[in-house]
Amino acid sequence: MSLETLMQLKTRQAQRRDECIAAGVLPDPNRPGLLEDAAKLVGTCMDMCPEYERVEREVQKELDRWEVVPGTTHADPTAAVKIYRRPAAGRELPLPEDVRPPAVLEKTLNYLFHTLLPSDPRDPLFAAVQPFLWNRTRAIRQDFIVQSDRGRTAIACHERIARYHILCLHWKGGVGADAWSEQQELEQLRKTLRSLIEYYDDQRLLGHTYPNEAEFRAYNLLLHARDPEALREVELLPCDVFSAPLLQTALHLRTLIQRSNMLEKRGQSRNTESTPNMFTRFFRDVARPDVSYLMACLAENLFSSVRVGALKALSPAYLDRHHGLPLAYVVRMLGMDSEDEASAFLTLVGIEIDSGAAKINRAARINEDQSLPAPFSALVERKRGDASCQAIIDRGLPTHAHMQAAPPPATRRLLSDAAPKAPAPPRAQAPALPHAQAPTPVALPRATPTPPAPAQVPPQPRPAAAQWPPPPPPAEPRRPRVPRCLLYTSPSPRDKR
């Protein structure tokens, strides 16, 4: 495309904007008005990228390598995807032809996750396309916001985007993603989950419910594990959502994550009083089959904090002359993958290692006033099994046992030319990350079956003389017991007013 074509499109854009303002489709910037009187914007762009943006970015050499015709610098209309642009003061509202309707947004998301994203997260292409997908999924959410769309399609797309961010958080952007930012990934995950929660609340007021609400409420609770406001939101949920096994499991893990010995600083969570510090049980329960793969990925982000809390809780229990704890014991206790990982972590926080033993005692000075990187845990990765990225993102089933491997997506030839595939390591080995070692298979603890309660003999009727005073009214039926969770109860209807 030439500069002349761009100038023609720019002139047509200005004329089209005047027409939309005159027709009331867009608000007049020179005439004040009420927000409730503004017309709802409905997108009419049927391409993944509007024509004007596609030409503009081609002229300005801003096209990504996934958006051009292979071997040229020209935009491919079937591969270009609308870029995210941060809203700025003075920026004009987009025209309807620059905004994609929900059906096109869903089609764009299918293209990103089924054509560009490889099926195996160990594939180098996973890291190669991660920055592109991070930006384009953000633009998809922006188009939903501009149109004030909170319907079924918006919720389904946000759910898939949230699962993708959790997957990237566990894989640290993919193998070899040196420029990946954990802070930026967490920021977009929080915003996606916040939008989802608002959508669920709005739809409930209209009488609509969604089957995946408990799943994403559980993710949000683990993402804000030490935020009391997140717990308050969960306590106000309807009983059917609150009692869902996924949400109850998240509540259980959240209780085990709490600490009472954190170094308190401004902007960080406060300590929790009367914390049991059941760190060993936390890592054991994360390995349970009923903890889903994505839920374990979010819990993994707190492994370092829980391990520091465990060391601070253990230190006062040992005298200075204690010989130390064997590294093999520390590995089992703190859910690590190898003694090398344990040695590196203990050295980082200031624990001395001597003859294969960790000097955890009263004299140890644990250095927690630093940024501890989140580990890549083979304990978590084992839960994925053979599930593909598409199976995890599109279906998000509760446990890895129900996940089936999806066929590899139809990948464009450009992908294989841009990043050569490396041979995948055997499944018995841990993923080829610098900080992940092949773990020794650990047998998961089996749950002991609970024997059935003995049958109760119905009480015999008392004589008529003993019926005064009259018996109390029958008790309100109790809520169904949710197995393997702590004793959480939803507030009564009177407390929800």
Where do the language-model regions lie?
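Short coil/turn connectors between adjacent alpha-helices in alpha-solenoid helical repeat scaffolds
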Residues: 124-129, 172-188
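N-terminal alpha-helical interaction modules that lie
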Residues: 1-150
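Conserved small/polar residues in nucleotide/adenosyl-binding loops
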Residues: 488-495
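Amphipathic alpha-helical repeat scaffolds of TPR domains
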Residues: 106-117, 153-170, 212-222
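Alpha-helical scaffold segments of alpha-solenoid architecture
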Residues: 182-345, 354-355
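Long C-terminal extensions of eukaryotic subunits of large macromolecular complexes
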Residues: 274-430, 444-446
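Short coil/turn linking the two alpha-helices of tandem helical-hairpin repeats
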Residues: 167-174, 228-229
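Flexible helix-coil transition and linker loops at the boundaries of alpha-helical arrays
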Residues: 142-152, 201-209
